[in-house]
């Protein structure tokens, strides 16, 4: 969902990009420019050659399973996707000298009560209240140790109107 909107923005601004998605929880029919997309998983063996051949210098990582209640029931699947595959992808980026890495994390790294939300601060220690938040927290630490230039965006719930598109 978020990755789609990032690509849509880049396409409309005519900025260069290339997207990767396994479409396990989205539809490829929404892709604006199918020539700039590859249907594969982030731990696929072809990612390394793709990254080196495209001369990529910045990566925006938006791939994750992202439903906190589901993460509590399916920890193995969330570990495999959000931690193991993501670490493999990050290591490929490091190996291919990616200069900038933008990781879309989550407000779920904070431990807060949704009924009593206080302002979250970046100086707070990560204390995830669910397994999804824990996977994001683990990768935040991993990213910080791998890239000289990295940005971590702790997004809160994102939703909005999209005309005639299904996700």
Each language-model region and where it sits:
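N-terminal Rossmann/SDR dinucleotide-binding element
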Residues: 1-58
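Conserved catalytic-core motifs of eukaryotic protein kinase domains, centered on the activation segment
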Residues: 29-31, 69-77, 112-118, 164
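NAD(P)H-binding glycine-rich loop region in Rossmannoid oxidoreductase-like domains
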Residues: 43-81
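Conserved Rossmann-fold NAD(P)-dependent oxidoreductase catalytic core, especially the SDR/UDP-sugar
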Residues: 61, 87-131, 151
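Short alpha-helix in the Rossmann-fold core of NAD(P)-dependent oxidoreductases
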Residues: 64, 79-86, 102-105, 135-136
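Conserved sequence/active-site signature of Rossmann-fold short-chain dehydrogenase/reductase
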Residues: 66, 109-110, 158-160
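Active-site Tyr-X1-5-Lys
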Residues: 127-151
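Glycine/proline-rich active-site loop of Rossmann-fold NAD(P)-dependent oxidoreductases
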Residues: 137, 159-167
């Amino acid at each position: 969902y978020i990755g789609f909107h990032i690509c849509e923005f880049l396409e409309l601004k005519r900025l260069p990009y290339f997207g990767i998605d396994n479409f396990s929880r989205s539809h490829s029919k929404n892709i604006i420019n199918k020539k700039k997309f590859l249907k594969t998983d982030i731990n696929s063996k072809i990612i390394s050659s793709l990254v080196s051949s495209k001369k990529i210098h910045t990566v925006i990582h938006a791939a994750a399973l992202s439903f906190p209640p589901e993460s509590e029931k399916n920890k193995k699947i969330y570990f495999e996707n959000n931690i193991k595959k993501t670490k493999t992808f990050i290591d490929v980026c490091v190996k291919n000298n990616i200069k900038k890495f933008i990781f879309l994390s989550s407000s779920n790294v904070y431990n807060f009560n949704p009924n009593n939300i206080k302002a979250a601060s970046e100086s707070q220690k990560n204390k995830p209240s669910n397994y999804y938040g824990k996977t994001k927290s683990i990768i935040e630490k991993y990213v910080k140790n791998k890239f000289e230039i990295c940005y971590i965006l702790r997004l809160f719930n994102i939703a909005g109107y999209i005309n005639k598109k299904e996700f």
